[in-house]
Amino acid sequence: MKEIVIATKNAGKVREFAALFAKRGVEVKSLLDFPDAPDVAETGSTFAENAVLKAEAASRRLKRPVIADDSGLVVDALGGRPGVHSARYAGEDKNDARNIAKLLRELDGVPMEQRTARFHCALAVAIPGRPTAVVEATCDGYIAEAPRGEGGFGYDPVFYLPERGKTMAELAPEEKNQISHRAKALTKLDEQWEEIVGGKGRTE
């Protein structure tokens, strides 16, 4: 395999995948390189289902191997919300500040020990003529009572990591990249890559 498409227009995500595949001599492209790539409605009820929907739709259209990810925040005290609706939790315009404000309102009065949460990442690999493979990983923490830190994006300012005494937004980028849900999923993908390209698709 000489080329793989990452089903995203997010340059940061593309860089993460490019670092992984550089050692394999695989060129990484994104949807920015393919203006005719389909927009896929994320109608799945799980992160894995949405990742598969996006990967398979793009792979069919582009006739190339495609990796798609779907990720979000799962909060136990909210019955798993925001879940697959994480990006648009407060509305359709993907506003991080409003999403965080809504989350904190819903957790108002909930004690810290009950604010357990995890970031979840699912990566789907769709290769024409082969079974779609999925790898998944999580990063566990708590929801802080107020935002802290300037780094990261999304819910990072309120995702507290007790073992580090910091929110995800307070971590240096290299520190976050060692422990984040996407970093863990990328590690799994790397470990299983030969099996995946050999056609033995599996879900974890």
Swiss-Prot record:
Q: Which UniProt keywords apply?
A: Hydrolase, Magnesium, Metal-binding, Nucleotide metabolism, Nucleotide-binding
Which cofactors, by name?
Answer: Mg(2+)
**Coiled-coil annotation: which residues?**
none
User: According to the UniProt record, which cysteines are disulfide-bonded?
Assistant: none
One GO molecular-function annotation for this sequence? ITP diphosphatase activity
The entry's active site is 70
Q: Which family does it belong to?
A: Belongs to the HAM1 NTPase family.
What does the UniProt record say this protein does?
A: Pyrophosphatase that catalyzes the hydrolysis of nucleoside triphosphates to their monophosphate derivatives, with a high preference for the non-canonical purine nucleotides XTP (xanthosine triphosphate), dITP (deoxyinosine triphosphate) and ITP. Seems to function as a house-cleaning enzyme that removes non-canonical purine nucleotides from the nucleotide pool, thus preventing their incorporation into DNA/RNA and avoiding chromosomal lesions.
Q: What is this protein called?
A: dITP/XTP pyrophosphatase
State the organism named in the record: Geobacillus kaustophilus (strain HTA426)
